[in-house]
From Swiss-Prot:
Protein name in UniProt: Retrovirus-related Pol polyprotein from transposon 412
EC number(s) stated in the UniProt entry for this protein: 3.4.23.-, 2.7.7.49
Source organism (scientific name): Drosophila melanogaster (Fruit fly)
Gene it is expressed from: POL
Reactions catalysed: DNA(n) + a 2'-deoxyribonucleoside 5'-triphosphate = DNA(n+1) + diphosphate
InterPro entries: Aspartic_peptidase_AS (IPR001969), DNA/RNA_pol_sf (IPR043502), Integrase_cat-core (IPR001584), Integrase_H2C2 (IPR041588), Peptidase_A2_cat (IPR001995), Peptidase_aspartic_dom_sf (IPR021109), Retropepsins (IPR018061), Retrovirus_Pol_polyprotein (IPR050951)
Reverse transcriptase domain ranges (all copies): 338-523
A Pfam cross-reference name: RT_RNaseH
GO biological process assignments: DNA integration; proteolysis
GO CC entries: DNA polymerase complex
GO MF term list: aspartic-type endopeptidase activity; endonuclease activity; nucleic acid binding; RNA-directed DNA polymerase activity
């Protein structure tokens, strides 16, 4: 700063006779200049000059840290010293030194003379040379110190005069000392004695107060920055310097001004105008973390990926044929990958095919772009999974809080920023016409790539809080609730990118957005919505036409179930069609559900972000089919939804009582919303009042105890919400939180056990609560049942002038007069119900069924009876049986069936049984079953639309031949893999009597080839057959075969189309033969035709299951002689280059039998597997009581005897029982079943 101020002052030259020349600012009298000039030099470099007047060589220290230029005094060399211009100098230690004066000298190089004023100092001044060239000289002549070339130069402009530089070297071993001025930072040249070309000198303190900065060094030429923090000059020993080999690095070009401007220009395209200057500052500071597409992709410095396979056998897949027009594009892309060090040449035995796929076309360019893709499907089959959990989307969305701004950062070629382990690179090999290559980075297409990338990103950004940024794969979204918060979070994320050498794509980064689309969700500062870009897809989604399309639609909607009220209740109609063995029948319920689900996605409910500083509320309800829940929070006096949830009940849950279903809904909702509510107090609201009582019981049932224990860790309050105020639906469809009103006065509050432990006065409140809940019934005590049989056959309570209680509708167990309960012909309902419950209690009756006869209900409505009964009855339930309507008119019958069978909503053209069940619930007429059966049978739509079982004629017993080869069945196998002999098919002939098989390999199945094979290989060996049976293949249905049969007087029978039973005998042999061949050609596919005859021989010498004879024995009259040691077959070593045919034949027969035995074992295993699928085993232990099936009893005897106690359990499911007479009996487990006492 001093030198800049001094240079602004100029004066007339006094020492040079050339008047008018501007002199430097260092020519002042003592009175004028009292400032202190520093000469703390920070470069230990020197250069030699020639004094123009005397020709003496002068060695100067080039010091960019010195304010002035100085020269040691020597009376023999200099004269014309101006004593008046003295200054104070400080820098070598703390002592101030006054200069001797000032002199003007000229430096000469060639024909050029360079004049300058130097301040003279004593000859003992502590510098190891004649003087110092300071910043005044360097700025005056625009000098440059060039240390970047093979030779170092001190350059004086504008004439580019070059003076060589020499630097005293400090060695890292041996003689290694250097002098450091006090409180100064200097740069010293250093040579490190290391076998590594590139080394890292880490930040370290080499002696007290002396520090060395991080330095990337070479063993030959290195500059090190050293800091002396002490108050005295220090002689430093460099032997204590520590260094290490440099690894995991990339050589990149230094950031140039042009490059930085290009990056900023790309970033500015996505800068909002309001925050442009702030973003430009922060991006300029971290300009190095952004990469241009023209630059090589670097790798991160924290994680390498290793690939692990199931075995070491190389996977080699042939290349696909590429069009000639794409060859040039492939070579160009591969060369770029090589240049960017993403791939390298390979000599691996692995190979995966490559192909080009088109990229999405740009609207501004007509040129088609391609992406190079490697098909790693075969590698993926053997690649061991690299399991790392991807973050849950709902967990990410929950962390958005009250975010106001969103910034999206995109990694440049994310997978390619992960380096592959050296030992894993061969697995990724691929090849082109120019050679084979392998990836050095993680390639696209490997099944482990997403999880591996997620692991790397999670590690790299582990210090970033979810409230600052969230990531999913290569989507990195920074959030902020204010401008300052966003800039702070961006700075931290950018810092992580720099720390771990992660590069961002500047063109794909966006900042300070008010909404962003993330994984199909639109995140805004007001809430979360589905991505509206998918609305068109939802609107135009086709109606599912089969189970697969229905499954896809349900899966698509399931992705957005967070936004769909009553998702489970609606989707169950369509989900039912996705189950196995369920015929696909798109009903009106399915269509309504389909339309509703689409409309819910197109017009979604706006969900709120969870605010974890506020209390949550869960509102639940259940229907017979499903349960639902909504998580809400209070925002400005309104309960707004945070999340919806629903699920369909299982079959068992659907059959439970209303109370159990409502309880299950609360239990499931609390577990489901655990991430939101755990560790905080929350409220549960239900419109089922008995649940408030159940959660406050002192001694609950075992079932309730289990549920309460599971919820013991949660801190919540159960509140009863009156039905009229509860807009949470009995299924989730009726949840409409926006209409909830302030209902504080209508809520009965119940405290859970968690809170009761925190209250000192819980006892009195608990007693008051029990008093209240005694009046609460768990279910309605009087309800209606629409029935037919119950009214006509099973009435258990009937009123006339007296009450009659019946047992099973027959035996009267009680009768008593109720005449005293009538006043003016009207029954006193209150007294009647009390007496009814009393009388039922005498006979221990808890539930009765009642027909609403006129005697009671002519003056009392059913609703009044139900309301009164629910208030009075405590321990008795009454089912009111509504009688069905009797129909006699034919037109009414037709109208009823037209509605309940033909109507698309109420009928749906169901079958006879279902239609009859629907009609019986409401109506009755004589011979109704017969009438409905005839109506449905004659329904034209049912006859046309519904499938029926295919008819099958009884099996026909064909004529049995008298001699071998009288009747021969012929068929063709193929195409098979082309053998070395050129064969792809085989003609098979089997004798219908002996089951003797002949197989002939052929090159093709033309008529001529097939006819020649049959004639030469069968007829000339075994003689012509009497009957020749074939299918309708063109190789048999032609003139050549017809002429052959005519010439040899062979009867030719052809099967009908699609009726393979005619040639069933050969079809069954084909299955066995195919298993033989398939089991071998899995290892060698080119010599199946050689092995074919060995397998045929095995087939003919194996006993047939049809007649228990070997086909060979029936044809030749004797059994075939087989080597005796075949039954003791051990490991078989292959024999190659065998000249002895007998040995080779023996070997092939051994292999054939081994494979036959292997197939038989596999067949047994398959049979066991199929059998076990139908087995329902029971678990028994010693001490259990069981019942024993009675195998010798008569029809009227018990099917089981016992119970007996299990004494012991032995092998093979044998169990020892201890009978009632203390005798032991051993029985099989299949005869037992558990006894429930």
């Amino acid at each position: 700063q001093q030198s800049e101020q001094l240079q602004q002052k100029q004066c007339q030259c006094t020492s040079n006779p050339r008047t008018g020349q501007l002199a430097t600012a260092f020519r002042y009298s003592v009175e004028e200049d009292r400032r202190v000039y520093t000469i703390n030099y920070n470069l230990n470099i020197f250069s030699t000059f020639i004094h123009a007047k005397t020709g003496v060589k002068l060695v100067f220290l080039l010091d960019t840290g010195a304010d002035i230029s100085i020269l040691k005094e020597n009376s023999d060399k200099f004269s014309n010293i101006q004593i008046t211009n003295k200054i104070n100098i400080q820098g070598i230690g703390q002592q101030k030194i006054q200069s001797r004066g000032q002199t003007f000298i000229e430096i000469q190089t060639g024909k050029y003379v360079i004049p300058h004023d130097f301040h003279l100092v004593d000859k003992n001044f502590p510098i190891p040379c004649d003087g110092i060239i300071g910043i005044d000289f360097i700025k005056k002549y625009n000098c440059q110190i060039d240390l970047n070339q093979e030779e170092d130069w001190f350059i004086i402009r504008p004439n580019n005069l070059k003076f060589p530089i020499y630097i005293p070297i400090a060695y890292s071993s041996g003689i290694n000392t250097t002098l450091l001025p006090a409180r100064s930072q200097v740069v010293r040249r250093l040579i490190v004695s290391s076998k590594d070309d590139n080394i890292l000198i880490p930040n370290q303190e080499i002696q007290t107060g002396i520090y060395v900065a991080n330095t990337i060094a070479t063993s030959s030429n290195t500059f090190v920055r050293i800091l002396n923090t002490t108050d005295s000059d220090q002689l430093v020993n460099m032997d204590t310097l520590k260094y290490e080999p440099l690894s995991n690095y990339n050589v990149v070009q230094a950031n140039s001004e042009h490059r930085n401007k290009t990056v900023l220009s790309q970033l500015k395209k996505n800068f909002p105008e309001l925050f442009k200057s702030q973003l430009e500052n922060i991006c300029s500071e971290y300009i190095d973390i952004f990469a241009l597409e023209s630059e090589p992709i670097t790798v991160n410095n924290l994680y390498k990926q290793q690939l692990r396979l199931k075995d070491d056998e190389p996977v080699y897949t042939k290349n696909y044929r590429s069009p000639h027009s794409q060859v040039e594009e492939i070579q160009a892309q591969v060369q770029k990958l090589i240049k960017d060090k993403i791939v390298e040449p390979s000599v691996s035995q692995y190979n995966s095919p490559l192909l080009l796929v088109p990229k999405k076309s740009s609207p501004n360019s007509d040129k088609k772009k391609w992406r190079l893709v490697i098909d790693y499907r075969q590698i993926n089959k053997k690649l061991l999974a690299d399991k790392f959990p991807l973050p849950r989307i709902d967990d990410i969305l929950d962390q958005l809080g009250r975010a106001k701004y969103f910034s999206c950062l995109d990694l440049m070629s994310g997978f390619h920023q992960i380096e592959l382990d050296e030992g894993s690179r061969d697995i990724t090999s691929f090849s082109t016409s120019n050679g084979s290559y392998r990836f050095t980075r993680l390639p696209f297409g490997l099944k482990i790539a997403p999880n591996s990338f997620q692991r790397m990103m999670t590690i790299a950004f582990s210090g970033i809080e979810p409230s600052q940024a969230f990531l999913y794969m290569d989507d990195l979204i920074v959030i902020g609730c204010s401008e300052k918060h966003m800039l702070k979070n961006l700075t931290e994320v950018f810092g992580k990118c720099r720390e771990y050498n992660l590069k961002l794509h500047p063109e794909k980064c966006s900042f300070f957005m008010h909404e962003v689309t993330f994984l199909g969700h639109k995140c805004t500062d007001k809430g979360i919505l589905p991505d509206d870009k998918k609305y068109d897809v939802i609107q135009n989604y086709p109606v599912p036409h089969d189970a697969d399309s229905a499954r896809r639609f349900v899966a698509f909607c399931n992705y957005y179930r967070r936004f769909i009220k009553n998702f489970a209740d609606y989707s169950r109609h369509i989900t039912r069609l996705c189950k196995k063995n369920v015929p696909f029948e798109w009903t009106d319920e399915c269509q309504k559900a389909f339309i509703h689900l689409k409309s819910q996605l197109i017009n979604p409910t706006l969900l709120q972000y969870p605010d974890f500083s506020k209390e949550f509320c869960i509102t639940t309800d259940a229907s017979k089919q499903a349960c639902g829940a909504v998580l809400t929070q209070n925002h400005n006096g309104h309960q707004l939804p945070v999340a919806y949830a629903s699920r369909a009940f299982t079959k068992g849950e659907s059959n439970k009582s209303t109370t159990e279903q409502e309880l299950a809904a609360i239990h499931w909702a609390i577990i489901h919303f655990r991430p939101y509510i755990y560790g905080k107090h929350f409220t549960v609201k239900t419109d089922h009042r008995p649940l408030t009582y159940l959660f406050s019981m002192v001694n609950p049932s075992s079932k309730l105890t289990r549920i309460r224990l599971e919820l013991e860790e949660y801190n919540f309050t159960v509140e009863y919400l009156k039905g009229k105020d509860n807009h949470v639906a009995d299924a989730l469809s009726r949840i409409t939180i926006k209409e909830l009103k302030d209902i504080t006065g209508n809520i009965l509050k119940v405290t859970t056990r968690f809170q009761s432990r925190q209250k000192s006065c819980a006892g009195k409140e608990q007693l008051d609560l029990q008093k209240q809940t005694k009046e609460i019934a768990s279910e309605p005590n009087v309800y209606e049942v629409i029935t037919n049989d119950e009214v006509r056959k099973v009435v258990t309570l009937q009123l006339n002038d007296s009450i009659c209680l019946f047992k099973h509708g027959k035996k009267i167990i009680a009768r008593y007069d109720v005449g005293d309960l009538y006043t003016n012909g009207i029954l006193d309902l209150d007294q009647f119900l009390q007496r009814l419950e009393l009388q039922a209690g005498i006979y221990d009756i808890s539930q009765i069924k009642m027909a609403p006869w006129k005697k009671i209900f002519e003056h009392v409505s059913i609703d009044k009876f139900k309301n009164m009964g629910n208030k009075i009855l405590k321990n008795l339930k009454v089912a009111l049986l509504n009688p069905v309507t009797q129909i006699n008119n034919e037109k009414e019958k037709e109208a009823i069936l037209s509605t309940l069978h033909d109507d698309p909503i109420q009928g749906g053209h169901t079958g006879i049984t279902k239609t009859l069940a629907k009609v019986k619930r409401h109506y009755y007429w004589k011979n109704m079953s017969k009438y409905i059966k005839e109506y449905v049978r004659k329904c034209q739509k049912c006859q046309k639309a519904k499938t029926t079982k295919h008819t099958k004629t009884p099996m026909t017993i064909t004529e049995t031949p008298e001699h071998a080869f009288d009747r021969v069945v012929v068929d063709t196998i193929g195409p098979l893999p082309k053998s070395e002999n050129g064969n792809e098919y085989a003609v098979t002939l089997i004798c219908d009597l002996t089951k003797y098989l002949v197989a002939i390999p052929i090159a093709n199945k033309s008529a001529k080839t097939v006819a020649k094979a049959i004639f030469e290989s069968f007829i000339l060996k075994y003689g012509p057959m009497k009957t020749f049976i074939t299918d309708m293949g063109t190789e048999y249905k032609n003139s050549i075969i017809t002429d052959l049969c005519k010439y040899l007087k062979i009867k030719n029978i052809t099967s009908t189309a699609h009726h393979h039973q005619t040639v069933g005998v050969v079809e069954r042999s084909h299955r066995t033969l195919n298993e033989y061949i398939r089991s071998y050609i899995s290892t060698d596919k080119t010599d199946w035709d050689v092995w074919l005859q060995y397998f045929v021989y095995c087939f003919n010498t194996t006993q047939s299951m049809v007649h228990n004879y070997c086909p060979y024995e029936l044809v030749f009259g004797r059994t075939s002689n087989l080597p005796k040691h075949f039954n003791k077959l051990h490991s078989i070593e292959p024999i190659y280059n065998i000249d002895d045919y007998a040995k080779e034949s023996k070997y092939r027969l051994e292999v054939a039998y081994a494979r036959a035995r292997k197939l038989l074992e596999a067949h047994k295993e398959k049979n066991k597997e199929n059998y076990d699928l139908k087995v329902k085993d029971i678990e028994l232990e010693v001490g259990d009581k069981v019942l024993l099936r009675n195998e010798v009893g008569h029809k009227l005897d018990f099917k089981y005897t016992g119970p007996y106690k299990i004494e012991s359990i032995g092998d093979n499911n044998n169990i020892t029982l201890l009978t009632n007479k203390n005798k032991k009996q051993i029985v099989h487990k299949d005869r037992l079943k558990k006894f429930h006492s």
